[in-house]
Structures are given as structure tokens and as C-alpha cells.
């Protein structure tokens, strides 16, 4: 039996749309205003640095022959579909987990757009301490990490705490 979308976790997909819009817009701005590998210091531990990543997190598999572009695109699509099915099976009142899934979906689709349109993921957030730089990342990566952290957090909640977090009152 079909249930109304508004009563399912899919009601929270608007958050994924917001993530995709913010991610793509921020990357477009960086690509329009920066040359590749150009870096602009903003504060003592943070630069905007335009970089491209042909792999996954921490440039995993970036040095391969190009097959990884399609491999990671397939993973992004697969994860997004699985999470949307999970959202459909949940209720709209399960806010925490559905927001977590929406953040992950939005991040995955933002990076998927880059892979399909640009052939690589465009990164620009560059945090560092002295001469050590954390791998450059983007807003999609931030959304994925926050979403994953929320999934883990939700897993530690007791059933009573889950009801309190998801209570509409």
C-alpha cells in the first residue's frame, strides 16, 4: 500500500536539495574566481584553496586511470537510493535520522554532480596548522560528515531518548 510522501521520512528531502544548491553554488563561485590551486588566506588556520579531487576522501584512488570516477558515481547513486528507501520506510516524525540521511544524500549528489560534469570533485575548504594541511574539502563533504555523525549519534540513543528527540511537542 502506498503511503503519502508527507507522512514518510521523504518529507525531509528538502534538506538534501538545500545542501545540493549550497554545494554547487559555492563550487561554482570558487571556480569562477580562483585559478586551480590558487589559495587565499582568510584567517591564520584557514584558506580558500581551489583543488580538484579525482578520487574519494583523502584522494583515495585519485591516481588511477579514470575508472574510479564511475565507480564513485555508482556508489553515490546507490547510497542515495538506499537512504531514500529507508526514509520512505520511516515516518516524518523521525526527524533526526531523516535529517541525517538527507544531509548524506545532499552531499553525495553534490559531489556526484561534480564527477559527472567536471570529471572530478571540486574542493576549496583548506584548514591547516603550521605547515600541515588537512585534505581540502567542500560543503558536500561537510554535509556527509555531519549526516554520518548524526546516524552514529542516533544509534546510541535509547528508545526513550529517541522518542524524546522525535517528539513533535
Swiss-Prot record:
It catalyses: Release of signal peptides from bacterial membrane prolipoproteins. Hydrolyzes -Xaa-Yaa-Zaa-|-(S,diacylglyceryl)Cys-, in which Xaa is hydrophobic (preferably Leu), and Yaa (Ala or Ser) and Zaa (Gly or Ala) have small, neutral side chains. The gene is lspA. The chain crosses the membrane at residues 4-24, 29-49, 70-90, 101-121, 137-157. The keyword Protease applies. The active site is at 123, 141. GO terms for biological process: proteolysis. One of its GO terms (molecular function) is aspartic-type endopeptidase activity. The keyword Cell membrane applies. Pathway: Protein modification; lipoprotein biosynthesis (signal peptide cleavage). It is found in: Cell inner membrane. NCBIfam families: lspA. Its EC number is 3.4.23.36. One of its GO terms (cellular component) is plasma membrane. Keywords: Aspartyl protease, Cell inner membrane, Cell membrane, Hydrolase, Membrane, Protease, Transmembrane, Transmembrane helix. It comes from the Bacteria. This is Lipoprotein signal peptidase. Its main location: membrane. It is a multi-pass membrane protein.
